[in-house]
From Swiss-Prot:
Monomer. The active site is at H23, D92. Changing Y150G: Great loss of activity. This is Protein-lysine myristoyltransferase HlyC.
Length: 170
């Protein structure tokens, strides 16, 4: 293994974070929480053009328990949480140079039969909402059925927790 490869990846991702209006003012501690586990678990995509990074995406495969933990506090995941289950969550999606469409197409092709969710934050209100994404080959009706099952499992489990702070209403 080339020892410089992880450092090179970190450099590329840090460049993208610094170039992203959403990410550039986030603390370094969030970079460590969001990026290092993704690289360690090989749960990321880094798109380059002419050897320059243009887009980055990372995801965690969470258990239901860790999904609830993440929704309650997006800074709560530790390295082992990233590979704790089969419930896929996009953690970072960064395309500051107009390559969002290319990253979207790449991810749909890379994960043709997979489902993902993400917390998307409105940059003006700083309010987050859960969004759903699916691969390019999965049937939309099947995807919706599975997402509904995920929501049912999530809501059922959240109702059992007295310390959950995430709002279940829009």
């Amino acid at each position: 293994m080339n020892i410089n490869k992880p450092l090179e990846i970190l450099g590329h991702v840090s460049w993208l974070w610094a170039s992203s209006p959403l990410h550039r003012n986030w603390p370094v501690s969030l970079f460590a929480i969001n990026v290092l586990p993704a690289i360690q678990a090989n749960q990321y995509v880094l798109l380059t053009r002419d050897d320059y990074p243009v887009a980055y995406c990372s995801w965690a495969n969470l258990s239901l328990e860790n999904e609830i933990k993440y929704l309650n506090d997006v800074t709560s995941l530790v390295a082992e949480d990233w590979t704790s289950g089969d419930r896929k969550w996009f953690i970072d999606w960064i395309a500051p140079f107009g390559d969002n469409g290319a990253l979207y197409k790449y991810m749909r092709k890379k994960f043709p039969d997979e489902l993902f969710r993400a917390i998307r934050v409105d940059p003006k209100t700083h309010v987050g909402k859960v969004s759903e994404f699916h691969g390019g080959k999965i049937d939309k009706q099947l995807a919706n059925k599975i997402f509904k099952q995920y929501h049912h499992e999530l809501i059922t489990e959240v109702k059992r927790k007295s310390d959950f702070n995430f709002s279940l209403t829009g």
